[in-house]
Amino acid sequence: MRGVNKVTLIGNLGKDPDILYLEGNIPVSKFPLATTETYKDKNGKLISQTEWHNIVLWRGLAELAQKYLHKSSLVYIEGRLKTRYWEDRDHIRKVATEIVADNLIMLDKRSDQHAEEGHEPLPGSENPFEDSDKPSE
């Protein structure tokens, strides 16, 4: 039987994406993504619990992230878990589990505020139903 390695997240970037170009000019981008779950404890108090995920994007998705995403951007990510092992300079074994994204959807609503902050508007981010001819009530 085949296994399934599928991750789906909606969350906010913890910092601007980093991008670097590997041999062959292949772009790779990384950023932390925060997801927050809220629940009530036994006393009815709302508790928020945030998990941090390391996201890795390759090629076109990496360039898209570099161009349009910034700290606090809300995104939908689909991908798979990937664990890397290596030794640092002191020969200490390190482990990192990351989410290699196959799909990225930008969920932030387009606003002029982004343009003022130096961020370009997202292509295709217009809502085709916004300000449409609504039937009068």
Regions found by a protein language model. Give the residues of each.
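Acidic, gly/ser/pro-rich intrinsically disordered tails
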Residues: 1-3, 21-24, 44-45, 92, ...
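Core FKBP-type peptidyl-prolyl cis-trans isomerase
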Residues: 7-49, 85, 95
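OB-fold and OB-like beta-barrel modules that bind single-stranded nucleic acids
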Residues: 10-13, 33, 71-82, 101-104
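A generic structural motif
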Residues: 17, 37, 61, 105-108
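Well-ordered beta-strand positions enriched in small/hydrophobic/aromatic, beta-favoring residues
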Residues: 31-33, 55, 99
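A short, charge-rich alpha-helical start-of-domain segment used by transcription regulators
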Residues: 51-53
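Beta-rich strand-turn-strand
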Residues: 55-94
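OB-fold/S1-family single-stranded nucleic acid-binding modules
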Residues: 88-106
